[in-house]
Amino acid sequence: PLHLSDAQERASDELIDSLTARRNHLLHAVCGAGKTEILFQPVLHALQQQQRVCIATPRTDVVLELYPRLQQAFPNTFVQALYGGADVEQRFSPLIVATTHQLLRFEAAFDVIIVDEADAFPYTYDAMLQRAVNKAKTSEAPVAFVTATPSDKLLAQCKKERWGYSFLPR
């Protein structure tokens, strides 16, 4: 089992609470705060509820970094990595890690979407990709945004729409 610090544990629990309540969530965690590890319990919780989860990130290198970690964390789950040029097995996967561009393939497919590195370049500026996130999720599905540097716009949206919020200073 993974050992989390108290702050990581709290953020993980807060994220589970938000996802269970089908509420969007902003996880604001500085670099090196172990944000990937914080996601494992919430992802496991969703998978145990027979939910389909997508972790989407703007950058292929992040997909390639997360994929083996997710395979290791969820050895009994078929995890799929989707990015430009990937070999794709045509079988259902309950847990997908994908570039945000790959979300365009999906419609109402995911019960939970986690956007990792939500501050990274293409997602911030690309309204089409933001629409893709909304299209790829089921109507009730919550979206969790994970970032070290949330934009003012994201923070304002979080506040206005009463999302869950977790902050990890280190």
Predicted ranges, named:
Residues 2-23:
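N-terminal pre-P-loop "Q-motif" helix
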Residues 45-48, 88-90, 105-108, 135-140:
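Conserved catalytic network of the ASCE P-loop NTPase/AAA+ motor domain
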Residues 20-44:
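Walker A/P-loop
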Residues 55-56, 81, 143-145:
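Structural beta-sheet core signal
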Residues 51-59:
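Conserved RecA-like ASCE P-loop NTPase motor core of nucleic-acid helicases/translocases
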